[in-house]
């Protein structure tokens, strides 16, 4: 049998040089590029150490103190600490709120919450995908095809933004809800740049007798830092992923109300919330088996960092950087959905330029600027939508401030100008457009400028000098 030191204690670069080299290339890409995908961030070396720790070895079905495996003494302590830190980080009273930290990521957290609250074919209302919602909030394609499990197992009617302003049309939301009578209303999204009126959502939910769930995956850092409206004041359940603005590992959390319900007309006296058992059993055994203990340990570390005073400074800067970049692009004459932002992201409408998001995404990628194509209201194609989404958390984590985001705005302006020139010369068809990307000197110039620009900023998680590709 092969000795343990041989297979078990040999480093990656020797065991698998191919994977090691690809990781080094990805490390170089992250270091030398401008990361503007709103759903991405850079986590800390402390979180990475927990992710790569011996916690990955342990299996632990069940909840702390009630496991189906032995040897979970320290795993129980870690998960209990993670749960208590979750509540503290989001300013939740543990007598009124519980939390499950076992979901593998944000999408499983959402579906576990639906499984706990609903029966198959119950009705859901979430923000329409082209309006800024998420695919797990229920979405049908224009042909009526079910896109996600949410739309397969539940009946969905989306609410939308106003076509002129880009803001959520709360009056139409209420009108639809009164007709549709959903059992669950979802607030939260992936590309909505404005604040959420949770009080209005609560009022609508109460009118139709619906649960109210907030998916705060994108702006959870702003909520924790009290730089955004608080969904916990109005919602029954709050879900989130943990790797976006929160800067944690790829995991998920479900917060839920517990204890006595507030007095309400027509409600029996002394009634209590029953979410605790339903949500915990929906996560396990209904949808998952053993939790990923390395992620839970890493999340506990990230939450400790969230509670540090420096995290609030970071959250404030995320918003300031987004506002600065939005102002720069508007001053250049570009069109932003809602004419700006209240949070960490910008939705850039490229349709007035005659461009599609996939073309701008491709040119930016070649310039070492990473962003993503994104639907804007009225789009019918998600492969070639009319916009791009831009987020500020990742580069804020590297220490960039307003003046640096003005420089990023300049890079984006140059990239879009190149995109327009290529389209004019080669045409709108993508296979023809791609010909203009080959050996393009202007793209190479931006790429070189971007690499020089990013060189001065530290990289969370590792030292740039340690990369083999530098």
From Swiss-Prot:
One annotated GO biological process: glycine biosynthetic process from serine
GO cellular component terms given for this protein: cytosol
Residues bearing PTM N6-(pyridoxal phosphate)lysine: 244
Chemical reaction(s) catalysed: (6R)-5,10-methylene-5,6,7,8-tetrahydrofolate + glycine + H2O = (6S)-5,6,7,8-tetrahydrofolate + L-serine
Pathway: One-carbon metabolism; tetrahydrofolate interconversion
EC number: 2.1.2.1
Pfam families in alphabetical order: SHMT (PF00464)
Subcellular location: Cytoplasm
Predominant location: cytoplasm
Cofactor: pyridoxal 5'-phosphate
Protein keywords: Cytoplasm, One-carbon metabolism, Pyridoxal phosphate, Transferase
MF GO annotations: glycine hydroxymethyltransferase activity; pyridoxal phosphate binding
Entries under Gene3D superfamilies matching the protein: Aspartate Aminotransferase, domain 1 (3.90.1150.10), Type I PLP-dependent aspartate aminotransferase-like (Major domain) (3.40.640.10)
Family of this protein: Belongs to the SHMT family.
Task performed by this protein: Catalyzes the interconversion of serine and glycine.
Subunit structure: Homotetramer.
Name of this chain's protein: Serine hydroxymethyltransferase 5
Lineage, uppermost ranks: Eukaryota, Viridiplantae, Streptophyta, Embryophyta, Tracheophyta
